[in-house]
């Protein structure tokens, strides 16, 4: 299943001078925050995959989750890069519904949907989407679940913008380092060389995104454990598809080692330079 919506391409609304619209900065920062937590779950899933005490079913389920997270990360990063690019790349709307297996991310996705809703009502740069956005409006998420999104809309009938714009509107290239860090981590998972990743924003771009900490999730997000989800999922009906056991996303133990090394370097305040 693709996590990129099938809506018409969107042209982002940065000015000719390269300055990014404050609302676009809000979207980018929120997506980077979401990605940080998803990347940590990918590390957990790799541990489950390589652990000697993991059952075949647990490995199959972890592979399934991992692949879906990777697709979501790619879509999110493509959108963030398109906002920062002075060339105004055309990309599709990123996923706007929270993954079923990561319910603790719903508050972040709720804010993200608000940013897109505000943009749709205030500018023509974002036409209605036939993909994830419309799924949210129809009360159906990426996993086919219904009702949750509709309940949220009823509880929040008016989506209004905050009076103040976050500090992400006035930032330095430290934000680009955060974006590059996530791209490097994604490449370490997929085995792709660094020069095949999305282009990092032009160093001359005067405004980019606020840095996102790559440290472990805080207590608000650490209550959920991926292995608990796998244990619950193992009770579902049907036999898991284990044909993805040799998936390229689990190429080798080396990928896990590289990912953890990158994470450690970031926590120590080192820059991610090629």
Swiss-Prot record:
Residue stretches of biased makeup (Polar residues): 123-150, 157-167
A cellular component term, taken from the record's GO annotations: cytosol
Localization annotation: Cytoplasm; Nucleus
Any one of the GO BP annotations: transcription initiation-coupled chromatin remodeling
Keyword DNA-binding among record annotations: no
Residue span of region Disordered: 123-167
Keyword Aminoacyl-tRNA synthetase in record: no
Superkingdom of this protein's organism: Eukaryota
Primary localization: cytoplasm
Keywords assigned: Chromatin regulator, Cytoplasm, Nucleus, Transcription, Transcription regulation
Function: Component of the SWI/SNF complex, an ATP-dependent chromatin remodeling complex, required for the positive and negative regulation of gene expression of a large number of genes. It changes chromatin structure by altering DNA-histone contacts within a nucleosome, leading eventually to a change in nucleosome position, thus facilitating or repressing binding of gene-specific transcription factors.
Complex formation: Component of the SWI/SNF global transcription activator complex composed of at least arp9, arp42, snf5, snf22, snf30, sbf59, sol1, ssr1, ssr2, ssr3, ssr4 and tfg3.
Identification of the protein by name: SWI/SNF chromatin-remodeling complex subunit snf30
Gene: snf30
